[in-house]
Swiss-Prot record:
NCBIfam families: csrA, PRK00568.1. This is Translational regulator CsrA. Keywords: Bacterial flagellum biogenesis, Cytoplasm, Repressor, RNA-binding, Translation regulation. GO terms for biological process: bacterial-type flagellum organization; mRNA catabolic process; negative regulation of translational initiation; regulation of bacterial-type flagellum assembly; regulation of carbohydrate metabolic process. It comes from Helicobacter hepaticus (strain ATCC 51449 / 3B1). Homodimer; the beta-strands of each monomer intercalate to form a hydrophobic core, while the alpha-helices form wings that extend away from the core. The lineage of its organism: Bacteria, Pseudomonadati, Campylobacterota, Epsilonproteobacteria, Campylobacterales. A translational regulator that binds mRNA to regulate translation initiation and/or mRNA stability. Usually binds in the 5'-UTR at or near the Shine-Dalgarno sequence preventing ribosome-binding, thus repressing translation. Its main target seems to be the major flagellin gene, while its function is anatagonized by FliW. It is found in: Cytoplasm. Pfam families: CsrA (PF02599). Belongs to the CsrA/RsmA family. It comes from the Bacteria. Coiled coil: none annotated. GO terms for molecular function: mRNA 5'-UTR binding. GO terms for cellular component: cytosol.
Amino acid sequence: MLILSRKQDDSVIIGDDIEIKIISIDKGSVRLGFSAPENCVILRGELKEAITSQNKQASQSDDIKAVSEIKFLLKAHKK
């Protein structure tokens, strides 16, 4: 992990087309601005974790299992 010290209005460039700019620094909070191509997904860490967790739960739900069982039974019935 690269760790940098930056002041307000400073920026960090990643690759050729991603810029992270320090917008403001307050007590216990830093506001960042991101400039990146539209195809680049930018998410807060906690949001990414929540999405991953929900996707994992959804894939293990009883509904998904029931659909899988129905698909299996339909395939077996066609034989």
